[in-house]
């Protein structure tokens, strides 16, 4: 399970004042959340090494976590979006949608790239977590625009607009956005390997959906090349699965690739993709499995 950990600067006296107002001692407030010494550091030294701890304390005290943070607002937003992203990777888009609804920030205090990152995740979770295509398109189109040069999140938003059109079965429009996004991606793929792997997978999945298996295989291999080049395991189980599926559809050997995808999905405890991999293996290789057992 991914954890949301970062050292943040806080206003410790806000915690102390709320605790005293509720007539709770440090031991009672800290119980089940953190050590008493950690709480003391929060209240007296304005240091919190785990943002989840701060959230839990604020929930117990019934105060807003934003009121206790003095860190640069962009750092707070980036941390919050990391949590949203972690949920999306596990295909927990409904939870991600609920998480991003809790994020409050002023656009005046954050840079353009971070705003475009927020708009991308807001659009993505509206689409896949709330099934609100109109809201999703609004955020994604805003997220795809830039007056100061493209950011990686502008490109991600373009890619996600492709996903929206794909879900609407408007495949010609989806193809326009997918192709445009991966064209722009060439300038970013090694600098932002995680985001590149996400987009190559999405694009491969689309081409697989419209039965252009050669293109799908090509994009899945592009994603795997980035993963190898940058030593990242991000989206690895998805890319391996997509490669295996399209190899099978092209009547090429695919069992070993499916086994690799299965291994990594199990390792990362990604139950979402694991179900698809197991179903394919059972369907595509049942006869060979039975022969091996004889």
Mark where each language-model region is:
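Amphipathic alpha-helical segments of tetratricopeptide repeats
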Residues: 100-107, 140-147, 179-189, 221-232, ...
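Single-residue signature of alpha-solenoid repeat helices
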Residues: 96, 135-136, 174, 216, ...
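DNA major-groove recognition helix of helix-turn-helix/homeodomain DNA-binding modules
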Residues: 52-67
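Residue register of alpha-helical TPR repeats
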Residues: 78, 117, 156, 196-198, ...
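Residue signature of alpha-solenoid helical repeat architecture, marking inter-repeat boundaries
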Residues: 74, 111-115, 152-154, 192-194, ...
